[in-house]
């Protein structure tokens, strides 16, 4: 069973990602990369949904597509809202280009691990390609 601290870290990732593009939870298309197994993901998402229901009763959380296998890099997380580029202060050696598409969102993972996004309301975290799981979340006002 995931600990409270583990969930808190997960929630902070979501919250900080919203804040760094200045749009909050009210309207967000967000891609979160997690190295959690499916049982833990279900646990975290239920906790997140419960929080959203308490805080914002009009919010809806949609779990959409599992794309591939990657892991979040949490160290020294920083985001530049003007360029929509998030970095961690650590380099990642990735030999191939990774692309993800979801609706209007199109993102590319470059060879040093920086993710860039061409959508105004999306930010994507820098990642390590480690283990299989990409959860795509669509959070918006109904």
Swiss-Prot record:
<protein>
    <recommendedName>
        <fullName>Putative uncharacterized protein DDB_G0280709</fullName>
    </recommendedName>
</protein>
<feature type="signal peptide">
    <location>
        <begin position="1"/>
        <end position="20"/>
    </location>
</feature>
<keyword id="KW-0325">Glycoprotein</keyword>
<keyword id="KW-0732">Signal</keyword>
<feature type="glycosylation site" description="N-linked (GlcNAc...) asparagine">
    <location>
        <position position="80"/>
    </location>
</feature>
């Amino acid at each position: 069973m995931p600990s409270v601290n583990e969930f808190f870290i997960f929630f902070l990732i979501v919250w900080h990602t919203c804040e760094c593009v200045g749009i909050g939870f009210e309207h967000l298309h967000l891609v979160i990369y997690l190295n959690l197994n499916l049982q833990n993901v279900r646990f975290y998402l239920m906790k997140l949904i419960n929080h959203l229901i308490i805080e914002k009763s009009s919010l809806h959380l949609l779990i959409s597509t599992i794309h591939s296998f990657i892991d979040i890099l949490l160290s020294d997380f920083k985001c530049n809202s003007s360029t929509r580029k998030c970095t961690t202060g650590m380099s990642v050696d990735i030999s191939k280009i990774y692309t993800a598409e979801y609706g209007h969102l199109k993102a590319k993972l470059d060879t040093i691990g920086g993710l860039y996004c061409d959508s105004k309301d999306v930010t994507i975290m820098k990642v390590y390609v480690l283990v299989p799981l990409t959860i795509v979340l669509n959070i918006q006002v109904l």
